[in-house]
Amino acid sequence: MSYNFTGTPTGEGTGGNSLTTDLNTQFDLANMGWIGVASAGVWIMVPGIGLLYSGLSRKKHALSLLWASMMASAVCIFQWFFWGYSLAFSHNTRGNGFIGTLEFFGFRNVLGAPSSVSSLPDILFAVYQGMFAAVTGALMLGGACERARLFPMMVFLFLWMTIVYCPIACWVWNAEGWLVKLGSLDYAGGLCVHLTSGHGGLVYALILGKRNDPVTRKGMPKYKPHSVTSVVLGTVFLWFGWMFFNGGSAGNATIRAWYSIMSTNLAAACGGLTWMVIDYFRCGRKWTTVGLCSGIIAGLVGITPAAGFVPIWSAVVIGVVTGAGCNLAVDLKSLLRIDDGLDCYSIHGVGGCIGSVLTGIFAADYVNATAGSYISPIDGGWINHHYKQVGYQLAGICAALAWTVTVTSILLLTMNAIPFLKLRLSADEEELGTDAAQIGEFTYEESTAYIPEPIRSKTSAQMPPPHENIDDKIVGNTDAEKNSTPSDASSTKNTDHIV
């Protein structure tokens, strides 16, 4: 027995009655297969962020950052189902181009109609874009490392995705978005993902204030990553997932998708080499693993808005410029006394801006055309003698930056004025560590006595003894380290260069 499909897809609502209409006939199955695989690949970036952030933190906060990445995925995916997708990608924004309607509230009617910006069905496009939302949320939380309460963090993330991420996603990716109509180009999220997460994390860090550090009370706290192995593994996951992140943003399985993957890999390689070489000459003639990983991620951030628009050779320039620019931004952060402990702003905020400007310079009409009939033509950037494009890119940067900083600040300050939504841990909790104070579990149990307990016991790990010494300081923070040799110091320098 088989279905008797006699209906024709309507292109509206659900796309037609699935009992009488084969909704798949209007779509290319190869395109759907590729974007489905890419959706799963993008999600791998979420635990990659968790491993990266956890490795860069101190041991007593390591589990909380793994927890935060998975929590961000859960909160963002629910928010995307609840109303996020509708606010960003509803087919009808009622002409405002600023934010969508509740047309798809609770995924109502999200099924087989063509999505607003691609030849994919709504349901598949919603899945793919939901992974982008999860990655953005996980990245942004890096600004709160080692000093934020976790329940207010969850509340903040849900609200931030609603009033910051979704409007900007509508501006840059919805067919009716005002930046789309202006002519601003953002292939895979230089503005929507990286600028918003970087500057959102910056505001979070500023409002929380710097971490308590009895050794450097007047200076900025600096700590060595407790696990460079986790940093490397997280970077591996991110680089792997980024190929799906940028390759899938083509929206189809055309030459443009594979072209953008090659550009992505080349920019990552050049960014990593640039950062590592800069650190080698600045910091005691030692090769730094954390610097290499930071540069790779900076290169990936820089190519994100550009990958499907620019020639492959320009990925070398984008990787080098973004790697160098983000490296310098880490120093700027220290000069401005901003305790952005995981460099969310220095790499994602700054890197997203650099990549967006370079997109306006290197965008080429012939690269965009490799998607064939699936894409609308563009005028290109400076290399096509379309000099207005950089102006359009700057307009997008200024608008997204102003909205992100203003709305995030208002949201966090309002929450912090509500007693049960206070943002920051107490001084005692911060000294104990977020893992013990807020979770009651630990990444490493070597300092605790083992007592068998059922898996659902109220306390699933023993409380560690109080810390007698300040742990994980980098060179220059303790008297013992002041007497270290230059070669000893160089092995620990600049480990605050992080994503």
UniProtKB/Swiss-Prot annotation:
Example GO biological process? positive regulation of filamentous growth of a population of unicellular organisms
Biased composition range(s): Polar residues = 483-493
Molecular function GO terms recorded: ammonium channel activity
Q: What, per the annotation, is the impact of changing residue 199 to Y?
A: Circumvents the requirement of the CTD to enhance substrate trans-location through the hydrophobic core
Which Pfam families does this UniProt record tie to the protein? Ammonium_transp (PF00909)
Please summarize what the entry says happens upon disruption of the gene. Answer: Impairs filamentation induction.
Q: Which GO terms describe its cellular component?
A: plasma membrane
Which regions are flagged for Basic and acidic residues bias? 468-482
Give me the ranges of the annotated region Autoinhibitory domain. 450-485
Outcome, altering residue 194 to A: Preserves transport activity while impairing the filamentation capacity
User: Reported effect of changing residue 457 to D?
Assistant: Silences the autoinhibition of MEP2, conferring transport activity even in the absence of the NPR1 kinase
Q: What does this protein do?
A: Transporter for ammonium (both charged and uncharged NH3 and NH4) to use as a nitrogen source. The affinity of MEP2 is about twenty times higher than that of MEP1. MEP3 has the lowest affinity. Under ammonium limitation acts as an ammonium sensor, generating a signal that leads to pseudohyphal (filamentous) growth.
Q: Which NCBIfam families match?
A: amt
What name does the UniProt record give this protein? Ammonium transporter MEP2
| Species of origin | Saccharomyces cerevisiae (strain ATCC 204508 / S288c)
Name of the gene encoding the protein in the UniProt record: MEP2
